[in-house]
Amino acid sequence: SDLTFDQRVIALRMALKIDILPRLSFALMFPVGLELSAALGVVEPGLATRAISWSVSALWVVIVIGMVRAREPARARSLKHANVVLHWVLFLVVVAIGLTSVLGHGPFPAGWLGWKILLFGLIFFCGIMIDREFDPVSPAFARLAAEGSKPDIELAIKSAIDRSIVWVLTLYVLVVVIAFLGTARPS
């Protein structure tokens, strides 16, 4: 890399701080979307659906903020694990809701909104994979700090980032398609 170790540490810290905004936005996306859909008359969610949606979102926001603020490694690991478990549960639940809706048996209309929910569920999988592929960066950075730059360390960092970027781009494509479906509402 053309950057010094200290510059790379600063860049990584900045990236991790910036990363909180899309994570918080993602945590709020479903309940806000549900409320907007209700306001537009597209869906009529019951009080229980709204309460569950907002409660899960609030829990998720607490986990995300906790992950960023955790100072003790054990607490950070615990919150990260909770985040991964929540992502897997939400992936399965939202994909199931989207799929049953697309097939005409779910809580949402089968057309564009069913597809939007299904694709939204796939974003959870992208988030899981982004985190999983990025995981090797931390131990590689620790080695970089201890041993200095070596080809295998640089390769580990570059490979992890490159694999993460594939999932980030996939997530962006899903967001664009979801935005199109919500805007165009094709029949």
Label each residue range with its predicted role.
Residues 1-187:
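Polytopic transmembrane helical bundles with strong interfacial aromatic enrichment
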